[in-house]
Regions:
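Thiamine diphosphate
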Residues: 1-144
Length: 144
């Protein structure tokens, strides 16, 4: 998690061709500042951030105003980091908007971040870190 942009930079530098890097919002949290490098060197990389508001999915069962440790802000505008460094930014909510953003990003040849909003219910909780989410009960006997 969080290696897509490093691989994207390597692919763009090695081939000189446009690259599409796809990662989730949590992964982007690890390597998002690589957008500065991508913009500084004007690499033709389009980053698609799948934004569902969490490591696996957003907070479906909040307790009062406290979010679980695997929850991120679904309202974050991840594309704005590209704008800050001179790249392009799109926020999309459906297939038509995604296709348009990808077409425009490819045609521009500029570094681009596409913030792809998906429902917070999409994704799957991992049994390996599920115990970090206090709202999740991983006891199979209790989930029947």
């Amino acid at each position: 998690m969080g290696v897509a942009l490093g691989y994207g930079i390597a692919a763009a530098v090695e081939t000189g061709k446009p690259v599409i890097a796809i990662e989730g919002d949590s992964g982007f949290g690890f390597d998002g500042m690589e957008v500065e490098t991508i913009c500084r060197y004007k690499l033709p990389i389009t980053i698609v951030v799948i934004n569902n508001g969490g490591i696996y999915n957003g907070d479906k069962n909040p307790v009062k105003d406290q979010l679980g440790p695997t929850v991120l802000s679904h309202s974050a505008h991840y594309g704005e980091i590209a704008t800050a460094f001179g790249g392009n930014s799109y926020r999309v909510n459906n297939y038509t908007e995604m296709k348009k953003a990808l077409d425009e990003a490819y045609a521009s040849g500029k570094p681009t971040v596409i913030d792809a909003q998906i429902p917070i219910s999409m994704g799957k909780e991992s049994g390996h870190i599920g115990n970090l989410n206090p709202q999740l009960n991983l006891d199979p006997a209790k989930n029947k």
